[in-house]
């Protein structure tokens, strides 16, 4: 089924220019939304808790900052861009008591709405505007007169104005310059979680670590294994990002292409596909979200344990040593401090 696409001519910027927008959070997406909306002539304020390290940064960039409760009371459009696991408590404590008839509650990701962790009053418009790129790219493209494709969705529309408002907001951050796709909270949430877990984060990470283990256990130097299964991954992903799988196969050697065709299906086979379906089923049923919430309620103990085990994998030790040789690689603070 073809998706609905919208561009600049389909969106009326004056709609969002006539509203007061509170952006909750000032991370990657929060700063991009706020600055771009401001530059589009929108009245914007940032909601950050007292003591947040981001307060000074936002103020230095000329933005008005208040607590989430203060800016929610002032605004009639509230964009929630805080971390998923913090959104429900922020909504309950700071946003919900200040909601008024005619307000709109927007999100950059649908998890909390789709899985009923947040239930907005019936008189509030509930929507989503989600650029398909990191905040620094959203902001850079906007400044350059371009845009990053975005998704919009409407979950609750008491006044029948939700889509026009979402498109106007998307135009304010440059999304309609590239193209905006209409979706649903269900589709965005479930596809996003599946991509992260089965392919982008979980699947890729385990593939890399297992490949490293196989090579080291076979007697190859850890440094050689690291280069072959992790370091060179960026070269392949960049080619796929720029032109798809066909571009990647065109660009690599015939030896690599032929070997990939033969061996790829031996690694990712029908059994793997069935396990991926099971992951999707856990997402669709809400099982993953229940476990995510339980982890937060238990003080992040499960997540911290998984992080610790991951950090102790031999590939991390080898990688840090090799990255010391790479002057062109931007080093994370944890490795340079």
Curated annotation (Swiss-Prot):
Species this chain originates from: Rhodococcus erythropolis (strain PR4 / NBRC 100887)
Cofactor(s) the record lists: Mg(2+)
Name of this chain's protein: Ketol-acid reductoisomerase (NADP(+))
Cellular component per GO, a single term: cytosol
Keyword flag Kinase: no
Domain KARI N-terminal Rossmann as annotated: residue spans: 3-183
One matching Pfam family: KARI_C
EC number: 1.1.1.86
Family note: Belongs to the ketol-acid reductoisomerase family.
Keyword field contains NADP: yes
Positions of the catalytic residues: 109
Keywords: Amino-acid biosynthesis, Branched-chain amino acid biosynthesis, Magnesium, Metal-binding, NADP, Oxidoreductase
Organism domain of life: Bacteria
Binding, Mg(2+) 2: 192, 228, 232
Catalysis: reaction(s): (2R)-2,3-dihydroxy-3-methylbutanoate + NADP(+) = (2S)-2-acetolactate + NADPH + H(+); (2R,3R)-2,3-dihydroxy-3-methylpentanoate + NADP(+) = (S)-2-ethyl-2-hydroxy-3-oxobutanoate + NADPH + H(+)
Gene Ontology molecular function: any one: magnesium ion binding
Top EC class, one word: oxidoreductase
Annotated ranges, domain KARI C-terminal knotted: 184-329
Binding site for substrate: 253
InterPro entries the record matches: 6-PGluconate_DH-like_C_sf, KARI, KARI_C, KARI_N, KARI_prok, NAD(P)-bd_dom_sf
Positions with a binding annotation for NADP(+): 26-29, 49, 52, 54, 84-87, 135
Parts of the chain that traverse the membrane: none
Role description: Involved in the biosynthesis of branched-chain amino acids (BCAA). Catalyzes an alkyl-migration followed by a ketol-acid reduction of (S)-2-acetolactate (S2AL) to yield (R)-2,3-dihydroxy-isovalerate. In the isomerase reaction, S2AL is rearranged via a Mg-dependent methyl migration to produce 3-hydroxy-3-methyl-2-ketobutyrate (HMKB). In the reductase reaction, this 2-ketoacid undergoes a metal-dependent reduction by NADPH to yield (R)-2,3-dihydroxy-isovalerate.
Gene Ontology annotations of biological process type: isoleucine biosynthetic process; L-valine biosynthetic process
UniProt binding sites for Mg(2+) 1: 192, 196
Listed pathway(s): Amino-acid biosynthesis; L-isoleucine biosynthesis; L-isoleucine from 2-oxobutanoate: step 2/4; Amino-acid biosynthesis; L-valine biosynthesis; L-valine from pyruvate: step 2/4
Cofactor note: Binds 2 magnesium ions per subunit.
